[in-house]
Amino acid sequence: MTTIDPERDLTLDRVIRAPRDAVWEAWTTPSLLAQWWVPAPTVARVDRLEVSPGGAFVTSMSDDGAPFVPHTDSVFLVVEPLHRLVFTNAVDSGWHPAKPEPVAMTAEITLDDHADGTDYRVVVRHGDAAARARHEALGFFEGWGAVTTALAELAEGGSRP
């Protein structure tokens, strides 16, 4: 289990009523990721999704379908199929040090079996307490909560809200 630093980390836990492979597929298939990665009604576009350690994770978003603006430019640090993804935006997809806005972070997504489907856990780590506080104030729980709900609905066989 990951050690949580409450001064610097934000967490979100859900049970998704779908098997782990369905949740994993929604994370690792570009056409599926685009359906839930940003809160509706914003639209996501997956520009690069190289699901391997060191692989690029690049997305854009649009409020009205055009133009798209950069959203995520990060790299995968850890990929354990059907169990764990870790990515950071502190290094961009070209492996250059980055100063992402609004905050630099490392996100760990963990999928475990649960009697009702998948135990889904997000841990987002920040460099210091101020960055954590800023991310929370900007709506971490609302934003990540909304996309997790959309992910769950997709993995459970529904459609995006």
What residue spans do the PLM features occupy?
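Hydrophobic ligand-binding cavity/cleft-lining segments
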Residues: 1-44
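Glycine-rich portal/gate segments that line the openings of hydrophobic small-molecule binding cavities
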Residues: 45-91
